[in-house]
A protein has these predicted regions:
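N-terminal membrane-proximal hinge/A-helix region immediately C-terminal to the signal-anchor transmembrane segment
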Residues: 1-100, 115, 119-127, 159-163, ...
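Cytochrome P450 heme-thiolate monooxygenase catalytic core
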Residues: 2-8, 73-81, 97, 113-268, ...
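Conserved cytochrome P450 K-helix E-x-x-R motif and the immediately C-terminal K′/meander segment
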Residues: 19-39, 212, 294-328
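Cytochrome P450 proximal C-terminal region
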Residues: 35, 125, 173-174, 292-295, ...
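Cytochrome P450 catalytic-core helices
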Residues: 265-290, 391-408
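Residue-level recognition of short, solvent-exposed, well-ordered loop/turn junctions
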Residues: 333-334
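Conserved cytochrome P450 K-helix/beta-meander segment immediately N-terminal to the heme-binding cysteine loop
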Residues: 340-368, 451
């Protein structure tokens, strides 16, 4: 047993306000600078959150993901999200309650249950894609958001009342537009959430109506359970080992987690997929050809995985320490927050030519390029807290990308990469992933027609500003 006192790794001495501002706007740039300056494990001190220890090495990340869950508490770290997602959300639960809820919630998001939704997702995507203008530049992220929101409302919540559906669409679009300043206030000063002025001016003012609509849908599902195959119907029917189901409040919290967190992350991943693909003509051409020829989805999966690697949707995940614990050789004190950096580990030397967009690295038998350590690729987190909706998200992205490329030919308006911008908790294309539809595809034309207007040369990718 060690007798050394807990301590923190070194970190920048900037004032807390300056660290908060840099972390809120340029999280990746700040982390990259600190890694160069202080090494692979360092401490940030933003306002209101306390000491945040960032770990960037696979072995240290493994220690965080596989360590004692009673000490490394994800729910406590996410507690500031409680006013939106609720106290029963998988994001905010710890311990036995998290285990119970995860078991109940997991079933609809795995295996055959997920595969049955693929055709429905494709139909929703096709209806949206057929409305896209030809020959005019537009950001693809809002279009992806329209698709993913509809998928969530129809396949997850199973909303059948059109008036309820339209109102939920409107409210959820507003909620997902929360700005960096409001988000930072929530993270840094959670006690302000209960202030009447903050409630009136923030997106929290919308939550009572969202809750009312969700409770109406839950009641409708309980009253008429037969003939429904949406996720909510499966959650209503789910029972634990004691035969207990989920309460209305618990169902509400899981639904709002999926609505607010789930569809926003998938939206962003899809926007980055097209932003990357359209700037890499060889990958675009190969994917188009394989889809046209009815090949399996291995290369499509490789494109999606490489997108999630080079453009992670969130910068990091975190755990709050309830007791001292050793991570990366440091005995960290209770009360500190440990934050595995998704972006840094996925751009590490573990990947050959890590900055390049190379889907082939994810194909079995490819000529190198893919890291062998399992904790170098963590877009959905890891361990017992790995995203419960990961399989659903991958199914959804496959169906949407396939549908888009089957129905329209796309090109990027410029060869220059879009920079990364912080949009509350997600890292989005700064210009929304702008695209141009060059034509509608009738039948399945030769794959080459989809890529003729792609940029001829790859312009070096622009990274978030480095800190000197």
């Amino acid at each position: 047993m060690t007798t050394r006192p807990p301590s923190l790794p070194p970190g920048p001495r900037l004032p807390r306000l300056a660290q908060s501002a840099l972390w809120a706007v340029y999280p990746g740039a700040l982390s990259r600078y600190c890694k160069r300056r202080f090494g692979p494990t360092f401490t940030l001190r933003p306002l209101g959150i306390g000491d945040v220890v960032v770990v960037t090495q696979p072995e240290a990340i493994k220690e965080v993901f596989t360590g004692d869950r009673e000490v490394l508490r994800a729910g406590e770290a996410n507690a500031v999200m409680g006013p939106i997602v609720g106290k029963h959300s998988l994001l905010t639960l710890d311990g036995e309650r998290h285990i119970r809820h995860r078991r109940l919630v997991s079933a609809p998001f795995h295996g055959e249950a997920v595969r049955t939704y693929g055709e429905r997702v494709a139909q929703i995507a096709a209806a949206e894609v057929d409305r896209w203008p030809v020959g005019r530049e537009f950001p693809i992220r809002p279009r992806m958001q329209a698709i993913t929101l509809e998928v969530i409302l129809r396949t997850v919540v199973g909303v059948s009342d059109e008036r309820r559906m339209e109102r939920l669409r409107t409210l959820l679009r507003k909620i997902t537009q929360v700005g960096v300043v409001e988000m930072w206030i929530v993270w840094a000063y959670p006690h302000l959430i209960e202030h009447p002025v903050v409630k009136r001016l923030s997106t929290l003012r919308l939550m009572p109506e969202v809750d009312r609509l969700l409770y109406e849908e839950i009641a409708a599902h309980r009253a008429e359970p037969d003939g429904r195959d949406d996720v909510l119907a499966l959650l209503v029917a789910a029972r634990d080992e004691q035969g207990e189901g989920l309460s209305d409040e618990e169902l509400r919290d899981h639904l709002i987690t999926l609505l607010v967190a789930g569809h926003e992350t998938t939206t962003t991943a899809l926007a980055w997929c097209f932003e990357r693909l359209l700037r890499h003509p060889a990958a675009h051409l190969r994917l188009q050809r394989e889809l046209d020829e009815g090949a399996d989805e291995r290369y499509l999966d490789a494109v999606l995985n490489e997108t999630l690697r080079v453009r992670p949707v969130i910068d990091a995940v975190w755990r709050k320490l309830s007791a001292p614990v050793e991570v990366a050789g440091w005995l960290l004190p209770a009360g500190a927050t440990v934050m595995p950096s998704i972006e840094i580990v996925q751009h590490s030397a573990a990947f050959a030519d890590a900055g390049a967009f190379r889907p082939e690295r994810f194909l079995e038998g490819s000529a190198g390029g893919r890291a062998s350590h399992p904790y170098t690729f963590i877009p959905f987190g890891g361990g017992a807290r790995r995203c419960v909706g990961a399989s659903f998200a991958m199914m959804e992205m496959r169906a949407i990308v396939r549908t888009v490329l089957e129905r329209v030919s796309l090109r990027a308006p410029t060869a220059r990469s879009e920079r990364v911008k912080v949009h509350h908790i997600t890292l989005v294309p700064a210009r929304g992933g702008r695209v141009i539809v060059t034509g509608r595809r009738r039948g399945v034309p030769r794959a080459e027609t989809a890529c003729t207007a792609a940029p001829r040369a790859e312009v070096p990718e622009t990274r978030r500003p480095a800190l000197a």
